Amino acid sequence: MYDNLKSLGITNPEEIDRYSLRQEANNDILKIYFQKDKGEFFAKRVKFKYPRQRKTVVADGVGQGYKEVQEISPNLRYIIDELDQICQRDRSEVDLKRKILDDLRHLESVVTNKISEIEADLEKLTRK
């Protein structure tokens, strides 16, 4: 699993926190950030540079004109797919944790209100 990331020398893909991708001249710059260890100020990161793929395509369907376009490298595309899987998984785990905490807070509120209601009913019974 994560063969493309491992081919970059990333031995523990599960430690990836996030990534950034930007275009600089004729290259794509990929930075991969790892989770910080306790006591570290900055997260460890690695940087990779990929040349953009050049293609010549027909400029329009009518004439004989051609134009050159640049695209992301196919290898980089596969790496981004793997990074998205890792980062989406982390995001969904955080969302699930937030949902569970919200459910607990709601349950706590419902139970507190029910206890107050029962205590009020008991108070009415003891007054008679």
Curated annotation (Swiss-Prot):
Protein name listed in UniProt: UPF0325 protein YaeH
Family as reported in the entry's similarity comment: Belongs to the UPF0325 family.
Origin superkingdom: Bacteria
InterPro entries: UPF0325
Gene for this chain: yaeH
